[in-house]
């Protein structure tokens, strides 16, 4: 069972996943805007469709994982992402790590449009259908290339240059 909590630690969302078969279910009364997640102290957020994909990704890329934030949407709805970004205004870069299928691609396009403009958005496409498949089949993936494609959906806005004033351009006036 994967549990999502609010800021006070109260459980607000729960998702059950079977270990032997493909059973998955959200518990009745769960609020998807409070997802299973981990908040690091950095300004990067990695977004996944499900908790198992989030954990699989961390297993594949464990170095400094605690410094980043991770969020499982519980599908492809943007409710959880909207809440997270409204509470974590310091987020500067969002990595959309959704499945490598049509639904995942369409959701990335939609979610990217809803992310505030001052945040960079990058799509990481897994080398298999999802990140759990990548983890389970990592030995079959050549050169450990677990990310099939990196797509920049939005760059970070660049600061406007400050005009330079040269001393030769200044007119000296005696007072």
Feature map (PLM): residue ranges:
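TOPRIM fold recognition
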Residues: 59-175
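Phosphate-handling DNA/RNA-contact segment within nucleic-acid enzymes
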Residues: 1-87
